[in-house]
């Protein structure tokens, strides 16, 4: 009991005192010299750093995120080139995403700062540039627009369109399954964006609810869907053959999100085409209609096996109000063989159109309140230089597993099965002279006849 208390105390950061906060505010350059003088003069009689932070945030001189960082003693990392960091939006294996503003253009963007290990070599740097150049060709109302990409002081970043709305994973978790007509409309719009990308020779490879953002049309207030994150994209047109190896697609590595991963993508990342995206879209459709993934529970390997071997429970069984025609669309999208699915997003659009209609919906974008400024920890938020604080973790991130021992941690088998898997992994490592194997390698062995 005492040790737990001591541990909690050790994890709780100490906020700075008033004088340190004011000094850090000046060093941060978040305010102009005139703003700094005026603010400190007006707040000269305020003794608590937290009260000063609350006042500056209420006057819109600081964002809540910036105020928290300053209270934790940070005074650098608020700028990346022309961009001022306003907030942290999320994080994943590839890096972190911030809300930022281009100071000259006064344009708010989503700034994706890649983790250093993602672009370690010169070759990786070249591939990064090729990928973002391809992404810059995607100008479509159902795809998040890429504005800028650059490297500053070893930090690679992409500036993208900022969408002021939730992703569908978060929305469904909070509100439950979508109305049937709205779910059809969301999938219709996502398929429209995928068709455009398909015509440009691009396969997304990580379609899932978390990568579909919602925003309201400024005039009609109807829902608009935006596809996010072509970071795992594969280029299929001859003009992009030089980019078929991306910084995010190492040979024999399973990448994507297990709950939404097509059978063929778990076997061979480089042979996927648009039909793989359609399978993932079908899994997403299933989630929007039922509020659950097609194969809930189990380990990552369990999920991948079930995607290959089992049929998901039909959506009209889980939700009896779903029309049979809609359930049949979901079932066809999730066919195990690519040849049994819709062959292009256009094929899907033709049959889905009667069920989709522009819809209105409301949501509230929630942000941390100033009352929480005293209850923050210092683990998962990071500014582009060195700052670390806490944020809400993403429930589902893309998966890449390539270490032989880590596979054994994921495989949910009994002790006897684990020994068989370990012997296979170690034998293969020795035979091939490799340092590790991927989940795909283990699955290939399981698929040959040892799966339960």
Segments and roles (model prediction):
Residues 321-334:
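Conserved C-terminal C-lobe helix
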Residues 4, 48, 73-313, 339-340, ...:
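Conserved ATP-binding/catalytic core of the eukaryotic-like protein kinase fold
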Residues 414-429:
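Short, low-complexity patches enriched in S/T/P/G
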Residues 2, 6-61:
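N-terminal anchoring/assembly modules that precede and organize ATP-driven motor systems
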Residues 26, 30-31, 57-62, 207, ...:
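Non-catalytic alpha-helical coupling and interface elements of nucleotide-dependent molecular machines
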Residues 339, 343-412:
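Juxtacatalytic C-terminal regulatory tail of Ser/Thr protein kinases
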Residues 444-452:
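Juxtamembrane boundary at the C-terminal end of a transmembrane helix
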């Amino acid at each position: 009991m005492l040790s737990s208390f001591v541990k909690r105390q050790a994890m709780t950061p100490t906020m700075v005192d008033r004088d340190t906060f004011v000094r850090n505010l000046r060093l941060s350059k978040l305010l102009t010299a005139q703003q700094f003088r005026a603010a400190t003069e007006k707040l000269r009689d305020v003794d608590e750093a937290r009260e000063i932070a609350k006042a500056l945030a209420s006057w819109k001189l600081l964002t809540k995120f910036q105020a928290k960082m300053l209270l934790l003693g940070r005074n650098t990392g608020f700028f990346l080139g022309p961009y001022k960091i306003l907030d942290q939006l999320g994080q994943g294996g590839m890096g972190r995403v911030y809300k930022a503003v281009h100071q000259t253009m006064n344009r708010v963007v989503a700034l994706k700062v890649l983790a250093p290990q993602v672009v370690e070599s010169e070759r990786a740097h070249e591939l990064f540039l090729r990928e973002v150049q391809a992404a810059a060709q995607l100008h479509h109302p159902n795809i998040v627009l890429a504005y800028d990409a650059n490297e500053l002081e070893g930090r690679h970043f992409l500036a993208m369109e900022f969408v002021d709305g939730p992703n569908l994973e978060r929305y469904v978790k909070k509100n439950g399954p979508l109305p049937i007509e709205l779910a059809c409309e969301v999938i219709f719009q996502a398929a429209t964006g995928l068709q455009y990308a398909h015509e440009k020779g691009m396969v997304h490879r990580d379609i899932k609810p978390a990568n579909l953002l919602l925003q309201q049309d400024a005039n009609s207030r109807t829902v608009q869907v935006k596809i996010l994150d072509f970071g795992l994209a594969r280029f299929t047109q001859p003009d992009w053959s030089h980019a078929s190896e991306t910084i995010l697609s190492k040979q024999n590595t399973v990448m994507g999100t297990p709950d939404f991963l097509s059978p063929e993508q778990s076997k061979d990342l480089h042979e996927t085409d648009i039909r793989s995206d359609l399978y993932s879209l079908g899994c997403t459709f299933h989630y929007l209609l039922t509020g659950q993934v097609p194969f809930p529970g189990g380990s990552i390997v369990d999920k991948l096996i079930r995607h290959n071997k089992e049929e998901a429970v039909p959506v009209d069984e889980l939700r009896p109000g779903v029309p049979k025609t809609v359930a049949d669309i979901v079932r066809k999208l999730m066919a195990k063989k690519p040849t049994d699915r819709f062959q292009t997003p256009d094929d899907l659009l033709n049959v889905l159109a009667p069920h989709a209609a522009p819809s209105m919906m409301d949501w509230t974008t929630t942000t941390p309140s100033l009352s929480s400024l005293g209850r923050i920890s210092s683990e998962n938020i990071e500014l582009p230089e060195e700052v670390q604080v806490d944020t809400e973790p993403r429930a589902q991130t893309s998966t890449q597993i390539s270490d032989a021992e880590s596979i054994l941690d994921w495989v949910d088998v009994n002790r006897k099965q684990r020994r068989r898997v370990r012997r296979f992994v170690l034998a293969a490592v020795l035979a091939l002279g490799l340092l590790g194997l991927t989940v795909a390698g283990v699955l290939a062995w399981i698929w040959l006849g040892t799966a339960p």
